[in-house]
UniProtKB/Swiss-Prot annotation:
The name this protein goes by in its record: Photosystem II reaction center protein Y
Listed GO CC annotations: chloroplast thylakoid membrane; photosystem II
Stromal-side positions: 24-35
Topological domain ranges for the Lumenal compartment: 1-4
Family (UniProt): Belongs to the PsbY family.
Species whose genome carries this gene: Emiliania huxleyi
Subunit structure of this chain's protein: PSII is composed of 1 copy each of membrane proteins PsbA, PsbB, PsbC, PsbD, PsbE, PsbF, PsbH, PsbI, PsbJ, PsbK, PsbL, PsbM, PsbT, PsbX, PsbY, PsbZ, Psb30/Ycf12, at least 3 peripheral proteins of the oxygen-evolving complex and a large number of cofactors. It forms dimeric complexes.
Stretches that traverse the bilayer: 5-23
Length: 35
């Protein structure tokens, strides 16, 4: 594993995980509101 590749992928992975977390949280709020 190249260290430079890891340095590039880490922020991208963090941003993707954060986005998915926020989308999931909002989706749960919408589902609770609907039911």
């Amino acid at each position: 594993m190249d260290t430079r590749l890891l340095v590039v992928l880490l922020p991208v992975a963090t941003a993707a995980a954060w986005a998915l977390f926020n989308i999931g949280r909002l989706a749960l709020q919408q589902l609770k509101r609907m039911s």
